Amino acid sequence: MHELSYATSVLNAILDAIKQQETLGRKVIKVTDINLEIGDLTLLSVDQLQFVFEVISEDTVCNGAELKAEMVKPKIFCMDCEFEGNLDTKDELEVRCPKCESVNVKLKGGKEFNIVNATIEFDDEE
């Protein structure tokens, strides 16, 4: 279950960002949601990622934060016919160009795992 390491990375990144804000004198109340961009080729289960995040963030300001994920389709570039576009992911190990059937292709995406943004509530009242 590699979802645990990904969820831990997200939590640590958000907590680091919160520490930076706190050094600027801002008081964080809570994190309400976190938006992710996840490539299909990471083979992550979003449901498992959300569950694990819920468990590990329990005693933090991220407790209750909604983890949202936008899945990113893999893209390929064919070295033979120069086709560039989305790759239809099937249960096959061999990747072929959908235009010419060549296996001489380069992956150009689909392995992403990015934090797009997070909504953080601050207590800025003095």
Curated annotation (Swiss-Prot):
Zn(2+) binds at C78, C81, C97, C100. GO terms for biological process: protein maturation; protein modification process. Keywords: Metal-binding, Nickel, Zinc. It comes from the Archaea. It holds the Pfam family HypA. Ni(2+) binds at H2. Disulfide bonds: none annotated. One of its GO terms (molecular function) is zinc ion binding. InterPro entries: HypA/HybF. Signal peptide: none annotated. Gene3D superfamilies: 3.30.2320.80. Belongs to the HypA/HybF family. Involved in the maturation of [NiFe] hydrogenases. Required for nickel insertion into the metal center of the hydrogenase. PANTHER family: HYDROGENASE MATURATION FACTOR HYPA (PTHR34535:SF3). This is Hydrogenase maturation factor HypA. It comes from Methanococcus maripaludis (strain C6 / ATCC BAA-1332). The lineage of its organism: Archaea, Methanobacteriati, Methanobacteriota, Methanomada group, Methanococci.
